[in-house]
A protein has these predicted regions:
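C-terminal catalytic "cap/lid" subdomain
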Residues: 2-184
Length: 184
């Protein structure tokens, strides 16, 4: 699952200055995520499924090919984290890895608070308290949003949140405890 990243934040910020409503801003973010997904497909070459799926049925079909499936979001208003959790649930994945810009879940934003403590394990209930404030604006999703946490909880999928680094992802896939383990 590719997120929109800086590209999305740039377009959303510009759109907000132009007076676009939140649904239009969500759509800009989704388009940026899909554009990033197209770049990833190109970078992966023959290892990747050749197109970016646009709905859950296309994802399920693409997974049957054995190729790497890169997705960039489906619906405005749904974070890429929530869609990624839905995909993990749909394909019955045994591990959901959320690779992000920090190396796990912290007691507060480590980019803003140098005293923030990294948590090795966190429950979905704790995550709901941390990220479930109910406020949602385009391009401002926290580490996880409430919908993503609820999907992780209902599917009981093993979830690890870690730094977006190939060696960290490899370690998580191999079963090494790295980042933060989400406990249902």
């Amino acid at each position: 699952m590719a997120g929109g990243g800086e590209t999305a934040r740039h377009y959303i910020g510009t759109g907000r200055k132009l007076g676009m409503d939140e649904s239009m801003l969500d759509d800009l973010g989704l388009r940026a995520a899909r554009l990033n997904a197209e770049l990833l497909v190109g970078g992966l070459g023959d290892a990747a499924y050749p197109t970016v799926p646009e709905d859950m049925n296309q994802v399920a079909e693409a997974f049957t090919t054995g190729k790497v499936v890169v997705v960039g979001g489906f619906h405005p208003g749904h974070s890429t984290n929530a869609v990624a959790a839905l995909i993990a649930e749909r394909v019955h994945a045994n591990l959901f890895v959320n690779a992000t810009d920090v190396d796990g879940v912290y007691t507060s934003d480590p980019n803003k608070n140098p005293r923030a403590k990294k948590l090795d394990r966190v429950t979905t209930s704790q995550l709901k308290k941390m990220f479930g404030n109910g406020q949602m604006h385009a391009g401002t999703y926290e580490l996880l949003d409430l919908l993503a946490v609820n999907i992780i909880e209902r599917s009981k999928i093993r979830t690890v949140i870690l730094k977006c680094d190939p060696s960290a992802i490899r370690k998580a896939i191999q079963g090494e405890l790295i980042g933060t383990l989400v406990v249902v």
